[in-house]
Amino acid sequence: MATLQSLADLGQANKAALATADTEAPVHVQKLDAQGRAYATGKRKDAVARVWIKPGAGTITVNDRPVDTYFARPVLRMILQQPLHVANRVDQYDIVVTVTGGGLSGQAGAVRHGLARALTYYEPELRSPLKREGFLTRDPRVVERKKYGRKKARRSFQFSKR
């Protein structure tokens, strides 16, 4: 390690460190299986979604059923289609999803997480807009456990003063 004699030397050392940091940025490459599909998993609460995408007409199949029948509420369909809207890729990919565990809301969040990850595997340049919107980050919030001496996680038993 070189010794620094003045502030100018410190500035030069800092520029050299920044230059090496820029060149060592990870290069994301396309990850496809033998059938030309991108595969990713997504998680939310107790739900785990396995997502496969390939170029197509825009059909979304969840557990061998159309998305309109599996997620009957429009809000849930909107949640899982958010990555496609951010990436401007609506009706460009056929999506096949297998999702297990949790409730419908957690499953929709898991599908959204997996779909965003699969899109980045198919088109690595979409990583920055999807990351900016927070779709690539796994939501760490889970149900708090019940404690003994309490009715629920935080709710106490009813107290009678007399």
From Swiss-Prot:
The keyword ATP-binding is annotated on this UniProt entry: no
Which residue spans traverse the membrane?
Answer: none
* Keyword terms: Ribonucleoprotein, Ribosomal protein
Q: Kindly list the GO CC terms recorded for this protein.
A: cytosolic small ribosomal subunit
Biological processes annotated in GO: translation
Q: Which GO terms describe its molecular function?
A: RNA binding; structural constituent of ribosome
Keyword Nucleotide-binding recorded: no
> Would you indicate the residue range of the signal peptide?
none
Q: Name one Pfam family in it.
A: Ribosomal_S9
The lineage's top-level taxon is Bacteria
Q: Which family does this protein fall into? A: Belongs to the universal ribosomal protein uS9 family.
Indicate what this protein is called per its UniProt record. Small ribosomal subunit protein uS9
Organism encoding this protein: Methylobacterium nodulans (strain LMG 21967 / CNCM I-2342 / ORS 2060)
Gene name, please?
Answer: rpsI
